[in-house]
């Protein structure tokens, strides 16, 4: 039995839920999200609480049970409060800036890297080396953050690169002569 899946999802004030078979539409003060689930699960709304249950006892249905519950819970949190990710850019001459709908990264390459910003993600830059990403969809936010980090992942010798705010980078010793 799934420990995550059996927990009900409480619907906060100001959040509306629309159920259509395995399609869930959630709208709130921060926006609207929808997702269609596949698999052997049933989603029901009972007294301002969402319940997810497996329709079969096989391994796939049990796996989807907890996953679907977590995704729906993140959707509810996203439309109510939103999600924030903070990225740090470390390195001499490494910086970023927003130009229109593009994030321009200067990361000691022969060219600047331009990344198109998805329409549902907002970027704030208090400094040139700090990027704050905000959005309602936790999955898309993490995906976009990983695309940014992939441009220059942190290296273990000097710690240069792009990383999450409190991410620990294990350091290595340099060459000894």
Curated annotation (Swiss-Prot):
Family recorded in the similarity comment? Belongs to the universal ribosomal protein uL6 family.
Q: Which GO terms describe its biological process?
A: cytoplasmic translation
Role this protein plays = This protein binds to the 23S rRNA, and is important in its secondary structure. It is located near the subunit interface in the base of the L7/L12 stalk, and near the tRNA binding site of the peptidyltransferase center.
In terms of InterPro entries, this protein maps to: Ribosomal_uL6-like (IPR000702), Ribosomal_uL6-like_a/b-dom_sf (IPR036789), Ribosomal_uL6_a/b-dom (IPR020040), Ribosomal_uL6_bac-type (IPR019906), Ribosomal_uL6_CS (IPR002358)
The record's section on SUPFAM superfamilies has:
Ribosomal protein L6
Keyword terms of this UniProt record: Ribonucleoprotein, Ribosomal protein, RNA-binding, rRNA-binding
Show the Pfam families listed in the entry: Ribosomal_L6
Tell me the subunit arrangement: Part of the 50S ribosomal subunit.
GO cellular component terms given for this protein: ribonucleoprotein complex; ribosome
Q: Name one GO molecular function term.
A: structural constituent of ribosome
What species was this sequence derived from?
Rickettsia massiliae (strain Mtu5)
Q: Which PANTHER family match?
A: 60S/50S RIBOSOMAL PROTEIN L6/L9 (PTHR11655), LARGE RIBOSOMAL SUBUNIT PROTEIN UL6M (PTHR11655:SF14)
Q: What is this protein called?
A: Large ribosomal subunit protein uL6
